[in-house]
Swiss-Prot record:
InterPro entries: AAA+_ATPase, Chromosome_initiator_DnaA, Chromosome_initiator_DnaA-like, Chromosome_initiator_DnaA_CS, DnaA_C, DnaA_dom, DnaA_N_dom, DnaA_N_sf. Domain I is involved in oligomerization and binding regulators, domain II is flexibile and of varying length in different bacteria, domain III forms the AAA+ region, while domain IV binds dsDNA. Residues 72-196 are annotated as: Domain II. GO terms for biological process: DNA replication initiation; regulation of DNA replication. Residues 414-533 are annotated as: Domain IV, binds dsDNA. The lineage of its organism: Bacteria, Pseudomonadati, Pseudomonadota, Betaproteobacteria, Burkholderiales. Residues 96-110 have a biased composition (Pro residues). Keywords: ATP-binding, Cytoplasm, DNA replication, DNA-binding, Lipid-binding, Nucleotide-binding. This is Chromosomal replication initiator protein DnaA. GO terms for cellular component: cytoplasm; plasma membrane. Belongs to the DnaA family. PROSITE patterns: DNAA. Residues 1-72 are annotated as: Domain I, interacts with DnaA modulators.
Amino acid sequence: MNDFWQHCSALLERELTPQQYVTWIKPLAPVAFDAAANTLSIAAPNRFKLDWVKSQFSGRISDLARDFWNAPIEVQFVLDPKAGQRSPAGATPLAPRAPLPSANPAPVAPGPACAPAVDAHAPAPAGMNAATAAAVAAAQAAQAAQANAAALNADEAADLDLPSLTAHEAAAGRRTWRPGAANANSEAADSMYERSKLNPVLTFDNFVTGKANQLARAAAIQVADNPGISYNPLFLYGGVGLGKTHLIHAIGNQLLLDKPGARIRYIHAEQYVSDVVKAYQRKAFDDFKRYYHSLDLLLIDDIQFFSGKSRTQEEFFYAFEALVANKAQVIITSDTYPKEISGIDDRLISRFDSGLTVAIEPPELEMRVAILMRKAQSEGVSLSEDVAFFVAKHLRSNVRELEGALRKILAYSKFHGREITIELTKEALKDLLTVQNRQISVENIQKTVADFYNIKVADMYSKKRPANIARPRQIAMYLAKELTQKSLPEIGELFGGRDHTTVLHAVRKIADERGKDAQLNHELHVLEQTLKG
């Protein structure tokens, strides 16, 4: 059992980033192996780690166990029995308590429970005059009130999905950076992730970069290095599965490494709406505002869900103003350009436009290949470039689709006991490839582009050359090459029998201009999203 765990840990250390390995794998320990039942029990130091490792790494550990023992092994994750003897992470205050008088009163244990009442009329201890006794009693009463406030704040936070604040933090609002404090022990690190809602797996190290996202990544790194100074707010937009969420988690994780005392919160817009509703129902807007206005970094995902929700927009506007005024960083994502989000107040749109807005485009061929190769490597599988290119050529929309296709290929290969080849890949992705080919056709592209630029579909085949017709025709040719499997001669034939060199010229022209013309790039992005449904 121990030999296996050494082998498993060594492999995972090579596959994961140092941060991931130290945070999630190193604290684990094998505690039991039942050879008769083929079960392996692995202990985690706390519930948070247990749940995360179970959801993120159980599959890989099970695969390694099967390979090691040459038999299917059921891996069970259990809580370390010693975990209950330690104080919960949340009981450790993250900011210093208010100082007490120099007299030495009996200590009051910190914790979420309400502190015991203090009897102000109790006799003074021997050797202590009345004035000193009164000071001690006052200090104890203040500390009891402080503990009660923390408990009440924690209850309200649980209702509103607001990570609890210590009483000192609740009173002081913002706090200063305290580098190194969060790394004091494993529980403190877990507590940071619980409060921030960050996914520690999503980092800059494992973010695959290409032309489609290099500007967004550069801006994200700049913001992580200079929060509240460079590009505030940072607004990232693009279709689903293109890496927006990965990138904003990477910013949060980097800032947490650099400044462990930072108050960071990632939240999906729908959860923010839910918090506003609960605060309204419970008349708890003071707690709501105190929490959101005191952050150092707010990461809000899919803000288009604010559409039509006026009260949510109003509260977010006040939070935005408070954060920016305090030089806190705000990062927002959406599926579309800010001005095109319907149902959002104009004053919010103007705030979004006041920082830096960056699009993340669908990954180009080389980037899709790199994503597949890296993902396969992380799964411990050797994927040939031929197979990666085949998949990347046929699946073009987003990263999630690529990763889903790869999982399907790996499962198909394992189930049938066959090597991963192009033939096996075609079999594994048969349904997916059929759907892709059925969804986007050259005819559909011609109609969509014609409607977008308000010309006739017949103009796509005609010999007319006015700019208002020739330009959309070139765009349609470019999209036909990008989104279908048609060859240049086949595309030319479908555009009124044009020569393949004409199509090649159009494709190169639009591809070149796309990188220089923001308006054209935006139009192409809209057309691609429309065609992909």
